[in-house]
Amino acid sequence: LQTGKMLVSSAVHNRDSKNGKFAYTGLFQSKKGRNDVPVKAFLIRINGKNVLVDTGWSEQCAINPRHHLGLALYFSSQPTVTLNDSVARQLGALGITPEQLDAVILTHLDCDHVSGLKDLKGAKHIYATKEELEISLLPNPRYRKALWQGVEIEPIEMNYDSRAPFGKSSDLF
């Protein structure tokens, strides 16, 4: 589900670049040095279960992105999203309510991955890795805790698995 787009600094792919520690934020960069990238959520339907990976942009981001993201994240991401792009509206068009989501899996808590989280808090389970939840407690310019405050996120314990793509896996069901 494409929930809109964002402008990303070309430094995102190389945060250790000579451009400085925070060059990836895109602040004070011209649009010429930024890339227009899609913001997506992935719906997986398997064995009668509805699983959503990430949430993309929300309805609130379409209505008032500066307020929703805060000034720094707004300027660093410059979201483009309409109400119909939001994950909640797209799921609704497919006949899926938040309560019909068996799981929402958050890969990480950057704003473009969790903006739509509050629209989906009726999901049966919302997961993120234990490590990501621990990192979210630290100061991080890429995170806006208001996007997940009041939403219960369950920690996933990742286990060593030599067959898994990154050497770890977890069984949710």
Task: Pin down the residues of each PLM region.
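Glycine/Thr-rich phosphate-binding loops of Rossmann-like dinucleotide-binding domains
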Residues: 61, 114-115, 136
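Hydrophobic/aromatic beta-strand patches that form the interior of the parallel beta-sheet core
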Residues: 1, 51, 105, 127, ...
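Extracellular structured ligand-interaction cores
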Residues: 39-41, 48-50, 104-106, 123, ...
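Catalytic metal-binding/acid-base residues of hydrolase active sites
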Residues: 56-58, 110, 132
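Active-site metal-binding motif and surrounding structural segment of the metallo-beta-lactamase
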Residues: 66-128
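Divalent metal-coordination and catalytic microenvironments
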Residues: 44, 53-54, 101, 108, ...
